[in-house]
């Protein structure tokens, strides 16, 4: 497994408190796979962002082979166990179920229990007409929210 890390300045975090969130509690995550079925596809990337030491830390876990999936899962869930809120984009429909199926396939005991999930796609979708977005792809939502 290859681990890549990069730090970014935190900027103004006041918007988080207005939403009832604390940066230290959050973990943003996304996965990349070779397909949609956890039984047939492979997990090759878990990306996460956490607030650490006054900066945002981006961590990417890359699989070099199929055998790296277990190590990636264990590493990610060790990080997740220190956080209270999980933020994703369409994570509740794809990323979380995909990882849960892999955990089950490998007989691993890690889980998402005790972590509150906030799926940005699910939160934005009901406001489709109000927001007048061209579509609900991640890039369109990022632009609307002012995220680079």
Language model region names:
Residues 33, 37-52, 57-58:
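RNase H-like nuclease fold core
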Residues 18-21, 36-39, 77-82:
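Short, charge-rich binding segments
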Residues 146-148:
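C-terminal or mid-to-C-terminal helical accessory/interaction module adjacent to the motor/catalytic core
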Residues 1-24:
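N-terminal accessory regions of nucleic-acid-interacting proteins
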Residues 56-144:
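Conserved DEDDh/DEDDy metal-dependent 3′-5′ exonuclease domain
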Residues 25-34:
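Two-metal-ion RNase H-like nuclease active-site motif
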